[in-house]
């Protein structure tokens, strides 16, 4: 499905909810850190997503540089906040997608792609013309506009989205986004409307649908309860419209200690979050083990594959 998307860098960028207006065509970088040339930091088979994404052969994951959020605890901070990455062409990116397919990937997994959407869509058009047939995953922090979700229509099969916060003060403190929930809620609703209910293949690998993640943070389980309440409301309105994934893997990376979250979540805290999810009927999904909070689950951003 081609939309004849221009890859000319925007002169007043509005690709994300910040609508910062950066003249990326003139070399300015936006709030996200992205400029006028596509940039990625890693492309490889990834085995640490939810089982229906990683499967047995891995998810063909491409980590893009920059991010529209500024999470003080980001485990990917070298690429999201510090600009690590390699400038590449859309033709090269198309080749990366095809190479991951040849390696046996179950899907193509685009990590924080929003600030590069026009470039990625152009690369997907090229790759599809050359035989790309895998489901495409948009791995997003949830801070999107409804317009952005709609712009991905026909390209994204699976939305792997976070719902990080409900509290505007907490999202302002930890991610520099006081409007996080106000933007994420309608965007996620648009994702669910677009993708439909989850569909799996014969191997149990997701082919279309939404996985909605929440990472429990130390000292903030009340906000986790509020997030889960919102998830439950969606599930009650349309049972099975997404797959919930509650995560315990929080590790205090980057500037976490400066914002009062310089420790891992306790077993007691996480058990309370899981129990709340279960009480709300959010049982048809994933509940991560506490042992997942280990630094070795973070990939090395050494420009592998790009």
What is the meaning of each model-derived region?
Residues 72-76, 82-87, 120-123, 148-149:
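Short, conserved acidic/polar surface loops in the N-terminal third of protein domains
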Residues 86-90, 177, 181, 263-267:
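Flexible, glycine- and charge-enriched loops at secondary-structure boundaries
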Residues 89, 115-116, 292-293:
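Positions that flank functional sites
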Residues 78-107, 276:
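Conserved alpha-helical substructure of the radical SAM core
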Residues 1-29, 197-306:
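Auxiliary Fe-S-binding modules of radical SAM enzymes
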Residues 1-68, 72, 76-81, 301-303:
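N-terminal [4Fe-4S]-dependent radical SAM core
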Residues 40-61, 95-113, 285-287:
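Short Fe-S-cluster ligation motifs
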Residues 95-259:
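Conserved AdoMet/S-adenosylmethionine-binding subsite of the radical SAM
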